[in-house]
Amino acid sequence: MSCVHNNTSFPVQIEAYLKEVFEKYKELQESKDTSLTARFARVLKYYQFLIYSAFSDPKFGIGQGENTRGLLIYHQMGMGKTILSLSLAISLSHIYNPILIAPKSLHSNFQQSLLKLIKLLYPETTDHSKELQKISRRFRFVSLDAYNMGQQIIKAGGSLNGCLLIVDEAHNLFRGIINSANDKTNARQLYNNIMQAKNIRILFLTGTPCSKDPFEMVPCFNMLSGRILLPLHYERFYTAYVNKTTNSPLNADKLLNRLVGMISYAGNQNELNKLFPTELPLIIEKVEMSPEQYRQYLLARDVENAEKHASSGMYEKMNTAALCLPGSEQESGSSYYVRSRMISIFASEMLTVKEDEKLSEAVQQLPKEAFTENSSPKIACMLKNIKTSPGPVLIYSQFVELGLHVVARFLEIEGYQCLQPLKVLEEGHNTILLHKDGKDLMVKNFAEDEPTHTLVLSSKITRFTLITGKILSKERDMIQQLWNSPLNIHGEVIKILLVSKTGAEGLDLKYGRQVHILEPYWDKAREDQVKARIIRIGSHDALPPEEKTVQPFLYIAVANQKMFYSIPEGSQEQKTIDERFHERGLEKSHLNSAFRDLLKRAAIECAFNGESGCLMCQPTNALLFHENFERDLRLPNPCQPLVKTEVKAYSISYEGKQFFYQKNKEVGLGYTFYEYNPIIKAYIEIKPSNPLYIKLIKHVQAGTTV
């Protein structure tokens, strides 16, 4: 069976296909079959196996032939997108060259997941190194954040022709494309290379598509379709698909028609939700700035406003270029209110940065007296909340020097010890981690097949550590192993982990009980990504039921009330930058969430999972959309709702096949005929335009009914 996504029959065909795959999945799980497909059925979750089958089946067509080139794997964070993509890479590596594009910090995650997958696939093998080496040789890794990404791709395979391209954290690529002012950026060059590639299969992995703007969909689905499926210009896209008055999707039915067949979604099924810890309602701490902090904040705002005024008008007459967000030309030089946002976290008169001195060094040289509740009411509030946590705690800030490093100094003053790796040494199956107090820490590899764990640490000291973009991958992996150790269920080894945006990507953490987000961001999906580092499938399985909860906190700096009301009326900014970012994020989140709901409705598993609002059409084999999006908007919607009804009909046999018919005076020729469709396992109406229709009328009128 081959299915083409630009066809009204596609939705019912894919639903029927997935039902067959699911039955096969249940059979293979109980079998002793040693084929690769059977092995994957015993390893993968059912929702992973559905996509594995649909994508790898040469007869079905997802990502092949006249169909789309691949899928947006929109699976809730923590549901195993990495394992799914590696499974497909292994299965298809004899046909396509696997190329993984991901932030450099995530490459080791994929390599570790690959070893884990091989162990699960071949449990009868004791030495997995040969199989790992054999499979690893087929993989090529490219750093999404590298300045020479294009050269890495050429080195990896010469071109993207004939490759299976896996892009992890794909939302970063989509944003990079639409934030580019020209075609010279890495992201835009990759977009052009993908669009020009031949015989390419694509897997875009993300738990947060459409997180910045719905316009992110344009590069995503153009690359997946291999053509200009969605309009390249921001204004044309918004005119066609966004109702700015209601802040909601416009022409949603026509957009759904274009997207169907290119999305896999998994995330809100009840049986899956049971595997996650309970996320408690977000606690928003609105923290009043101290007088000195607010004074410095106002000075920073004056500077930012002056810079904004100086640059205003420079781009007013510039039309938005293709694949660009409005203002992306300016944003490359924008401060994004960095000064005022950092001061909202920490402000001290003692902080001075000398020429050629790094900000982090200046923070380290500050005396203990600089770290008080007055210099950072936010951090003081956060520390009080942390003391109530019964288990490990995750702290996030996008600011490292005046965010995480300041928090680290506060923690040290409070008596916490920083477990900071200086060197990681491999010794057989053991790993030695040298940290800054000079003592050796012996750690057994915490793999599932390693039953014993050796840890040399004082239980009297409460520890914290940091993961930022600058940390080496081996150190990052070791910190994750320590956090996930069965000996760290309640934070006995690492109580607090501080992470930046880059540092948080790809982390898979267990046991976490609190998440602290030190400042709001206008992209609420980022907050979800941070929480998803510890809210994952099975992450709290080792804890008793009453401890399987995660409490998130968000900290928002507000004006010092006494000083605010002393400012002449009309001169005050009514809301702080923190408040404005938070409110803008909520507003933007509403629109982005509505478009993510459309992606769920267009997902190939939607009807199979019994979701509501799924795109399901009468299987008339008509084109689902016109290639020209403007003309498509003017045409009637070819997707007529699929309605299943029982009718009384007569049976007729013609040329060895069974048909049914009704006498129907409302039809021009007086008959309605039905034929069996094996794909959807139901009878569908034969249209009068079908040549078979006239033949069946003559057959009935000749009196040969059965």
UniProtKB/Swiss-Prot annotation:
Q: Which SUPFAM superfamilies match?
A: P-loop containing nucleoside triphosphate hydrolases
Q: What class of enzyme is it?
A: hydrolase
Any Gene Ontology CC annotation: virion component
Q: Which GO terms describe its molecular function?
A: ATP binding; hydrolase activity; RNA helicase activity
Biological process, per Gene Ontology: DNA repair; replication fork processing
Q: Principal localization?
A: virion
Where does this polypeptide localize? Virion
Motif DEAH box extends across 168-171
List the keywords (alphabetical). Answer: ATP-binding, Helicase, Hydrolase, Nucleotide-binding, Virion
Locate the residues binding ATP. H75, Q76, M77, G78, M79, G80, K81, T82
Protein's name according to its UniProt entry: Termination factor NPH-I homolog
